[in-house]
């Protein structure tokens, strides 16, 4: 929806907040929320069931996945599959590896200065049309590279090689 504040969701697990950098990102997002009254709504959720978490995700525009990541994992892929923007690892090497030109992940890096991340987030939240396009491109990326039928076929080929005694394809 284009009306109202941009909703940012940060899913947190007490045992992973430092490892994933979500506590650090929550602090940064809260600062932005204070600086942009009425324009941003930041919500942190902790230890929800998957069903409850997915409901929260569906109500959000942007989901902060993790700061300390090189490529998107399950949470980021779920976020993009549901047509939401994800902030996570999305380094160039990841896109090269999957042979993807579209870069729909708001790339986070612990090497980047927090003030720079904050300004990039501010710019992202100010451009609702850009957010919409990024969300659509994320959905398409997941469809292209993570279709369940394609992944199942990869697993099947791998297991067939194992059964034949050649896990590395040197049949």
What are the roles of these predicted feature ranges?
Residues 1-49:
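Conserved catalytic-core segment of nucleotide-activated headgroup transferases in glycan assembly
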Residues 113-132, 163:
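C-terminal "capping" alpha-helix adjacent to the active site of nucleotide-linked donor transferases
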Residues 52, 67-72, 93:
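Active-site donor-sugar recognition loop in glycosyltransferases
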Residues 128-160:
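A charged, aromatic-enriched C-terminal amphipathic alpha-helix characteristic of glycosyltransferases
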Residues 58-71, 84:
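Acidic donor-binding loop of glycosyltransferase active sites
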Residues 54, 76-81, 95-96:
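Short alpha-helical segment that forms part of, or immediately flanks, the ligand-binding pocket
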Residues 85-93:
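Short hydrophobic beta-strand element within catalytic cores of glycosyltransferases
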